Amino acid sequence: MSAQSVEEDSILIIPTPDEEEKILRVKLEEDPDGEEGSSIPWNHLPDPEIFRQRFRQFGYQDSPGPREAVSQLRELCRLWLRPETHTKEQILELVVLEQFVAILPKELQTWVRDHHPENGEEAVTVLEDLESELDDPGQPVSLRRRKREVLVEDMVSQEEAQGLPSSELDAVENQLKWASWELHSLRHCDDDGRTENGALAPKQELPSALESHEVPGTLNMGVPQIFKYGETCFPKGRFERKRNPSRKKQHICDECGKHFSQGSALILHQRIHSGEKPYGCVECGKAFSRSSILVQHQRVHTGEKPYKCLECGKAFSQNSGLINHQRIHTGEKPYECVQCGKSYSQSSNLFRHQRRHNAEKLLNVVKV
């Protein structure tokens, strides 16, 4: 098989929109020997995420032979990692980022990818921002609960847009709700259901979707699977489920009949059906369904870091980055282990510490 026919096959087996197909065709015509170093400006190529997905989804049956398969994989990998413009460290970060997102629960994968992080640190910041939104102790309980509902609705809506079965969507929503309760118990209560000052924790309202006693199998944010209803911060009988009969969901989606208590939530939901992404980036053309996501994305282009530390002047693109940094100056360690009392300034460090406790428990079981 000639080199020209191989190149034509490379084009045919990659289903792309017209513009992307034209770009790939021009590239191959200008570089017929398959050598590295295309004359096409890299900033004119499609989103690297497109090529990453094609690289991972490529099958042997998609090529006429092993040599062609390797050639096509090499080309897709190069279009994804872009060694002509990226340093070795940046390429390493891209691979680490891909694996990090892959090990997240499905609902968090969607959330992170929708924010388009360019490295592992940005992905962590996205999750920490979500965590602070779900469980900010400085806000009234009613506001935290409402934020939690909106974020859950947002994540579930994104999963609906990708066609997840309703049973999986229910599991996603339950996991998100339970995760916020788990985080609350980790930070504010000990194993006997007491708060940090020794008083009994007030009765908590169990999220309505979580009537069963078993915790969902996959917990968000890396929380160890050591909690069950009736243990640790929430002893049996401590939950009270309350209903507000006067609360009605008056906003109905004409497409699917789903009800919403807020008109703004209905508007966001309807974008699932319409595919509307009204917030477009003028720099690269990417579009987003929410203005807040666009604002975060634009900082990639502008380098804007609006959150500045008053102590040392260091600036951050995300508020959560500033909050974490300020603990260096204050010495604050708000994340406390409920088993041994050790405190940490970062939630990720607490989760790693908790896993060590779990490992010790497993070793004790094995020894017995």
Swiss-Prot record:
GO terms for biological process: myelination; negative regulation of DNA-templated transcription; positive regulation of transcription by RNA polymerase II; regulation of transcription by RNA polymerase II. CDD domains: SCAN. It is found in: Nucleus. Keywords: DNA-binding, Isopeptide bond, Metal-binding, Nucleus, Phosphoprotein, Repeat, Repressor, Transcription, Transcription regulation, Ubl conjugation, Zinc, Zinc-finger. It comes from the Eukaryota. GO terms for cellular component: nucleoplasm; nucleus. SUPFAM superfamilies: beta-beta-alpha zinc fingers, Retrovirus capsid dimerization domain-like. This is Zinc finger protein 24. The gene is ZNF24.
